[in-house]
UniProtKB/Swiss-Prot annotation:
Pathway annotation: Cell wall biogenesis; peptidoglycan biosynthesis
UniProt cross-references to PANTHER family, sorted A to Z: CELL CYCLE PROTEIN (PTHR30474), PEPTIDOGLYCAN GLYCOSYLTRANSFERASE FTSW-RELATED (PTHR30474:SF2)
UniProt lineage: Bacteria, Pseudomonadati, Pseudomonadota, Gammaproteobacteria, Legionellales
Enzyme Commission number: 2.4.99.28
One Pfam family it belongs to: FTSW_RODA_SPOVE
Keyword set, alphabetical order: Cell cycle, Cell division, Cell inner membrane, Cell membrane, Cell shape, Cell wall biogenesis/degradation, Glycosyltransferase, Membrane, Peptidoglycan synthesis, Transferase, Transmembrane, Transmembrane helix
Stated name of the protein: Probable peptidoglycan glycosyltransferase FtsW
Membrane topology recorded in Swiss-Prot or TrEMBL: Multi-pass membrane protein
Gene field: ftsW
Annotated compartments: Cell inner membrane
Length: 394
């Protein structure tokens, strides 16, 4: 139930009798819309590959539903947890993630998939450490900006400290390698620093360093050079380095205005690699057409607008950790979704990033559910603080 009639007194000692909304209905609606579309499209896009490797068509759908169930259970806990708890554990959590990033690089411990060692195998479950690191980085930076706001804005030394952490995390991610996660984390950190009021000369200096470093890394690996070349002209090598992108573009072309119909994709029949993960958006374009694309973009836009509004409201209430956290989480989701859609449409080089709340993936789905729960919790605290009431806790 989204509304209730509080029986508490406000800060002036007067009873509050009018119903208030516990959580943001627009945000909840957008999220559940994306989750429903995601389950439908994972079911559709993975039928052939599930049948080929597991001899039953809904293997990936069942697993995705299980991941979503776990994510929602954890979200119920997070949404009842005070945001100050995450501020207290932000530093230990960051240190723990750096340790896990080191552990995942050890052969025999880290699980290698498609040439990248990104997963820790915990029995039958693979944990992608980079997803947890994104969350830890936002918590750490939010806490640091609260503690060192003046130093970050006025002193180069205060600015360098979080950059050192970012550099360590980026190096460890690139050793996996996970170029996509590095881009998302770096972009999120830069955006949060900009919102915190860092001097422009520091900010643009950082941007220059980061962009230069990423460009050098991109051209230093033959694998990444091949991806860049394929991005610039995928049809020049459509059966090799440009194969995935050309198949994605074919899916977009087949979709037209209203798509071929749910379940009617041709590209998912093992023509388009990673159709249920990194390139799910292409299958959405093929089966649901431009109309489906616009629906997905609209739902993401609602999510982003509401997330930014939650961050701004927390800032006006001088709840700065909650504000920076809400901004960071929203920027992360917006950036990752934009990059994924851009890659699928041929506007950006391939990065290997999932589409938040839609693509198949255990770690990403669970973490995304936690992210949404954090936004809802901050919004809940905003609403109740504005009335002088104590937020609900577990």
């Amino acid at each position: 139930m989204n509304t209730m009639r509080p029986r508490h007194l406000n800060q002036r000692g007067k009873p509050v009798s009018r119903p208030i909304s516990l959580y943001d209905k627009w945000l909840i609606g957008a999220v559940f819309g994306l989750l429903i579309i995601g389950l439908m499209m994972v079911a559709s896009s993975s039928v052939m590959i599930s049948t080929k490797y597991f001899h039953q068509p809904f293997h990936f759908l069942i697993r995705q539903a299980c991941y979503l169930f776990v994510g929602l259970l954890l979200a119920l806990i997070v949404v009842r947890t005070d945001s100050s708890f995450w501020e207290k554990i932000s530093m230990p959590m960051m240190i723990g993630c750096v340790f896990l990033l080191l552990i995942v690089l050890i052969p025999g411990i880290g699980k290698s998939v498609n040439g990248s060692r990104r997963w820790l195998a915990l029995g039958p479950i693979g944990v992608q450490v980079s997803e947890l690191t994104k969350l830890a980085m936002i918590f750490y930076l939010s806490g640091y900006l609260v503690r060192q706001q003046e130093a970050v804005c006025e002193s180069i030394f205060g600015f360098i400290k979080p950059m050192a952490i970012l550099a360590v995390v980026s190096v460890l991610l690139l050793l996996e390698p996970d170029f996509g996660a590095t881009v998302v984390i770096s972009g999120t950190v830069m955006a949060m620093l900009f919102l915190a009021g860092v001097k422009l000369r520091y900010y643009f200096g950082l941007m220059l360093v980061v962009v230069t470093a990423l460009a050098l890394l991109a051209v230093s690996s033959p694998y990444r050079v091949a991806r860049l070349t394929a991005f610039l002209d995928p049809w020049a090598d459509q059966y090799n380095s440009g194969y995935q992108l050309t198949q994605s573009l074919i899916a977009f072309g087949r979709g037209g205005w209203f798509g071929t119909g749910l379940g009617e994709s041709i590209q998912k029949l093992l023509y388009l690699p990673e159709a249920h993960t990194d390139f799910l958006f292409a299958v959405i374009a093929e089966e649901l057409g431009l109309f489906g694309i616009l629906v997905v973009i609209t739902l993401y836009s609602i999510l982003v607008i509401r997330g930014l509004n939650i961050g701004y409201t927390a800032y006006t209430q001088e709840r700065h950790f909650a504000s920076y956290t809400a901004y960071g989480l929203t920027i992360w989701l917006a950036l990752q979704a934009s990059i994924n859609m851009g890659v699928n449409a041929g506007l950006l080089p391939t990065k290997g990033l999932t589409l938040p709340l839609l693509s198949y993936g255990g770690a990403s789905m669970v973490i995304n559910c936690i992210v949404i729960a954090l936004l809802l919790r901050i919004d809940h605290e905003n609403r109740w603080q504005s009335l002088g009431l104590r937020p609900l806790t577990a």
